[in-house]
């Protein structure tokens, strides 16, 4: 392998068409995500969900993505990009039908089932599309991956902007129902289907060299697979066990036996990877990048799922939507500047990630203390700049340094980030909100807490159970035109819970900053950050 020079040309004549088709695909995901973030309050008011239940539904929007992107990443070089695009299109349409089946008057369990599964299938479609788009753009533009992957992922905040505007104009302004709002994500779904239709696709560098799946997995190895398998085991134990227990009432799904079964599944997957790679340990650097991307998913996407709800609670729902649109628009604009930052300012991808982590930490601390709309705009601008380059730049680093992995390492990394957001970020923030709010209200007004507490306790990993506030009662207190003293106390406690949640969340990018600083020193010790290329055909070997 050798270090490649930096150029900007693409390797296929239809590269720009494919780039913008991928842009539209991720745009559809962003619009759906942005609208869902704005209708959480509608779901809480209509069905009485707690913060933890809303967090679990939001979490399904990440875990489904993980399965789509990892499975898609493993098979994409074998079955081709086109078949995965068709599958994603069908999943997107199916998700709308399932989600819309949740209606008022149903039992809470039934509505929860439809919303959870609908969100999961929506995310499955998003993950399948990203299993196409990320390696496709990385292959099309091998000499400037950071720039073009950031352009590709500019569609995510663009989708959030459009989704936020839908909530602001149709939801807050025109009082349009949440189903009509959510159904608008089908418009870009049709557009990306048309854009991809009839196109030819290039092979990844690793696939063109004739590498097998086992060979592509060797740099991932046992270490990299361990990160993904731990999250898969956690999904089976916590989320799948939780939803099966919720609907069946069978205590088995909350028992130690179910936990052992979940971890056995994870171990089995790890053994399969070991067999495919001849039990290669894998790259330590890639292992560190996978772990760090788990933090990226938790802090960026996990926070995105809650930030509109939280800022809308601290200020007003309308202001929360405006702020969400503002930060997303800022991210959209900045992602077109990655080439300028990297080439003109001479900041390496790792240096950029370090700077963003520090801004993310500072921004979240500032957001936790906002009192006014103007102050919120400044604080969220700092946070938005910080989170702008995390996801696409991490993907670019993997594409630059590990070309032998083809689409697999990039897809596993995306899956790890989304799985972390779904299992740790979204539910963790929901649990934190329930916990901090309940603790404050129990301390200051225990009688009011007893009146407003939820019927079902919230759990998160190994932490103690906590009983948050009933979503319907909290929503009534927050939206009352003239609050009673008790309602004001509950609303104030909820705001305090939101502030403490953001403070706790801020420590994640601080840890990331330490990791990126160490990686920066590592690359400096080996002569600087450089793109690695596969120069010669690789001899085929048997992967047992």
Outline where the language-model segments fall:
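Helix-loop-helix hairpin linking two adjacent transmembrane segments in secondary transporters
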Residues: 152-266
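Central cavity-lining transmembrane alpha-helices of secondary-active solute carriers
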Residues: 59-74, 325-338, 505
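Extracytoplasmic
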Residues: 17-51, 130, 134, 301-311, ...
């Amino acid at each position: 392998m050798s270090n490649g020079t930096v150029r900007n040309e693409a390797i296929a004549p239809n590269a720009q068409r494919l780039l913008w088709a991928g842009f539209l695909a991720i745009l559809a995901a962003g619009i759906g995500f942005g609208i869902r973030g704005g209708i959480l309050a509608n779901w809480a008011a209509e069905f009485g969900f707690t913060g933890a239940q809303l967090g679990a539904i939001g979490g399904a929007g990440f875990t489904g993505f993980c399965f789509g992107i990892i499975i898609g990443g493993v098979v994409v070089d074998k079955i081709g990009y086109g078949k995965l695009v068709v599958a994603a299109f069908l999943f997107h349409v199916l998700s709308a039908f399932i989600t819309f089946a949740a209606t008022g008057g149903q039992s809470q369990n039934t509505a929860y089932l439809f919303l959870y599964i609908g969100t999961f299938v929506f995310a499955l479609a998003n993950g399948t599309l990203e299993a196409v788009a990320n390696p496709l753009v990385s292959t099309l533009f091998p000499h400037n991956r950071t720039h073009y992957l950031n352009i590709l992922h500019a569609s995510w905040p663009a989708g959030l902007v459009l989704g936020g505007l839908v909530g602001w104009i149709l939801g807050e302004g025109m009082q349009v129902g949440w189903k009509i709002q959510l159904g608008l994500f089908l418009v870009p779904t049709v557009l990306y289907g048309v854009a991809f239709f009839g196109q030819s696709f290039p092979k990844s560098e690793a696939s063109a060299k004739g590498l097998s799946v086992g060979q592509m997995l060797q740099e991932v190895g046992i270490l990299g697979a361990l990160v993904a398998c731990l999250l898969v085991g956690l999904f089976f134990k916590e989320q799948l066990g939780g939803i099966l227990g919720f609907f069946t009432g069978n205590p088995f799904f909350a028992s130690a036996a179910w936990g052992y079964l979940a971890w056995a599944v994870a171990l089995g997957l790890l053994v399969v990877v070991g067999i495919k790679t001849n039990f290669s340990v894998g790259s330590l650097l890639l292992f560190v990048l996978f772990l760090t991307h788990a933090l990226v998913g938790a802090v960026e996407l996990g926070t995105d799922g809650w930030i509109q709800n939280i800022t809308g609670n601290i200020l007003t729902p309308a202001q929360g939507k405006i702020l969400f649109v503002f930060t997303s628009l800022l991210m959209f604009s900045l992602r077109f500047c990655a080439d300028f930052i990297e080439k003109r300012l001479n900041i390496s991808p790792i240096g950029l990630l370090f700077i963003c982590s520090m801004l993310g930490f500072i921004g979240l601390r500032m957001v936790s203390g906002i009192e006014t709309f103007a102050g919120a705009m400044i604080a969220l601008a700092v946070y938005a700049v910080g989170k702008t380059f995390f996801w696409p730049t991490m993907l670019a680093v993997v594409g630059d340094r590990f070309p032998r992995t083809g689409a697999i390492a990039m897809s596993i990394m995306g899956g790890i980030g989304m799985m972390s957001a779904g299992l740790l970020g979204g539910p963790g923030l929901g649990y934190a909100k329930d916990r901090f709010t309940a603790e404050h209200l129990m301390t200051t007004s225990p009688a009011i807490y007893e009146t407003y507490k939820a019927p079902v306790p919230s759990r998160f990993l190994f932490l103690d159970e906590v009983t948050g506030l009933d979503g319907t009662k909290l929503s009534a207190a927050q939206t009352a035109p003239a609050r009673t003293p008790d309602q004001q106390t509950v609303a104030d406690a909820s705001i305090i819970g939101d502030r403490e949640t953001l403070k706790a969340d801020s420590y994640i990018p601080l840890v990331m900053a330490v990791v990126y600083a160490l990686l920066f020193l590592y690359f400096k010790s080996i002569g600087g950050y450089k793109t690695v290329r596969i120069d010669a055909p690789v001899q085929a070997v048997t992967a047992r």
